[in-house]
Swiss-Prot record:
UniProt protein name: Microtubule-associated protein 70-4
Pfam family, any one: MAP70
Gene: MAP70.4
Segments for region (Required for targeting to microtubules): 208-410
Main location: cytoplasm
Length: 515
């Protein structure tokens, strides 16, 4: 069991650690069961040693009982012989007592005869007294001698009886001790039977523990399979997490591009205001006073279209960030569910078979429901970008091209506007648009012109006296400056509103990502 525990510990410690870095509950359960088996083995060893000691004591007690039985038999034989001797001595005592009584009666009869003789001698004085008494005295001496012998025999018999009584007392004590030992032997035999029953119970428990150990080994193998499947699912979720990080990086890049574009827009607005003021001052004395203002308005409309397009791009990035946050939440919930399943499997081994069957049925569904990783181009950008959205690099290049002086900027704007409206490329693009084959560049400029037209309509709706105001300002010679100031104020308001909306959107996306 120790080797199996070591193998399981080495195998599980490297490959079966849970996600939180804590030890595996399956390994803890195996260690606990191994400790229980070791304790049961120790108890069995103690029981075996006790049984051996009890067997030795039983053998010694059997030998002692055999010796005691032999001694009891000898004592019984001695008692039987002593009883026979006592009976014989009692018979002798009775015989002697009868003889004594007879001797006493003969003595009394002799005394009576002597009295009669004395009385007759006194009367007749025929026979002498000594002649009659001498044989009787000899008889009396003989009887007295026999009586003394009988008394000695009686004393000896009394002593022998006392010795027999002491021997009987000792034999009774020996019998009591033998009975006590027999009771102890019976108790030991009962304990031996109980220990045998406990041994059988321990053997059955050992068999059950071995079966449970085998079942747990099978459960561990199943858990290793499920852990391998979970690792595969975690790797797939890692791919999804990489995709989520990629989209988060894209969102961060888009936010940075947004900030840079906002800065470039602010610089462009300042630059456009300066150009408008210089062009208005330059064209103040000529006949074509409204031409630079119209061109400035066109450039402004184009810039507003680019701003709107960038806002749409930011909105798309925010939507993608929200979708990524939702994916992250779903993946976290799935991981929590998987951890709960693992804990339930480790705690309830009986229910682990059912959970393994359900998890085996549920894992392919999870792998099929996981989103695919998007195909990323070499530049790191997503290929799902619509063709109508321009790249930030193009707008940055357009806005970053600022001349050194204000006069050179005004002249370049004039030439650029003339080339845009008078170049053959624009004519070709218009023709292609009529045929239904429009390139991406012309499509971008067409979209900008639409947005610019919408902005112009909004400006006209906001300022109903726009033409009258322009006429008055041109009549006074201050059209360019007033129009530029009015448009600058409108642009600042719109920029402030857009920045507030964008900052709220970015905060919401950051909060969702952090959650």
């Amino acid at each position: 069991m120790g080797s199996l525990g070591e193998v399981v510990e080495h195998g599980v410690s490297k490959d079966m650690l849970p996600f939180d870095g804590h030890p595996d509950p399956v390994v803890d359960e195996l260690n606990r069961l191994e400790n229980l088996l070791r304790e049961k083995d120790r108890e069995l060893g103690h029981a075996y040693s006790e049984i051996k000691g009890l067997k030795v004591t039983e053998a010694l007690k059997d030998k002692a009982i055999a010796e005691l039985t032999k001694e009891l038999k000898k004592q019984d034989e001695k008692l039987s012989s002593l009883e026979k001797q006592l009976e014989q001595k009692n018979l002798d005592v009775k015989r002697l007592s009868n003889e004594r009584k007879e001797a006493l009666s003969a003595q009394f009869a002799a005394e009576a005869t002597l009295r009669r003789i004395h009385s007759s001698q006194k009367d007749e004085e025929v026979v002498p007294f000594d002649a009659i008494i001498a044989p009787l005295e000899s008889d009396i001496k003989a009887y007295r001698h026999e009586i003394a012998l009988l008394q000695d025999d009686k004393k000896a018999l009394e002593r022998h009886l006392k010795l027999k009584e002491a021997a009987l007392v000792e034999a009774g004590n020996i019998l009591r001790s033998a009975l006590e030992r027999a009771l102890i032997v019976e108790d030991v035999q009962n304990q031996n039977i109980e220990l045998k029953k406990q041994m059988e119970i321990y053997h059955e428990e050992n068999k059950l523990l071995e079966k449970s150990n085998r079942q747990q080994v099978l459960d561990i193998e199943r858990l290793t399979h499920t852990i391998a499947e979970l690792e595969e699912s975690i790797l797939s979720t890692g791919d999804v997490a990489n995709a989520v990080r990629f989209y988060q990086n894209q969102a961060a890049k888009l936010n940075e591009e947004k900030r840079t574009l906002e800065r470039e827009l602010a610089r462009a607005k300042v630059y456009v205001n300066r150009v408008a003021s210089t062009t208005a001052n330059e064209w103040k004395d000529d006949a074509d006073k409204l031409m630079p203002v119209k061109r400035w308005l066109e450039e402004r409309r184009l810039l507003q279209g680019e701003i709107q397009r960038l806002r749409d791009k930011i909105a798309m990035a925010e939507k993608s960030a929200k979708a990524e946050a939702q994916l992250n939440d779903k993946l976290r919930r799935k991981l929590k569910a998987l951890e709960d399943d693992m804990r339930n499997e480790s705690s309830n081994t009986s229910a682990s078979n059912k959970d393994n069957a359900t998890s085996k049925q549920a894992t392919p569904k999870r792998s099929s429901s996981q989103p695919r990783r998007p195909i990323i181009s070499a530049d790191g950008a997503d290929k799902r970008r619509p063709a109508s959205q321009p790249r930030a690099s193009v707008s940055g290049k357009v806005l970053n091209k600022q001349p050194g002086s204000e006069t050179e900027a005004a002249e370049k704007n004039r030439h650029a506007a003339a080339k845009r409206f008078d170049s053959p490329r624009s004519a070709k693009s218009v023709a292609a648009g009529g045929r239904g084959e429009r390139p991406v560049r012309s499509h971008l400029w067409a979209h900008r012109s639409k947005v610019a037209d919408d902005a112009g309509k909004e400006n006209k709706e906001q300022n109903p006296n726009y033409k009258a105001h322009l006429g008055d300002s041109h009549a006074d010679g201050d059209c360019g400056v007033q129009c530029s100031e009015h448009e600058e104020a409108m642009d600042l308001r719109k920029l402030d509103e857009g920045k507030a909306d964008d900052s709220d959107a970015v905060k919401s996306t950051k909060d969702s990502c952090e959650i």
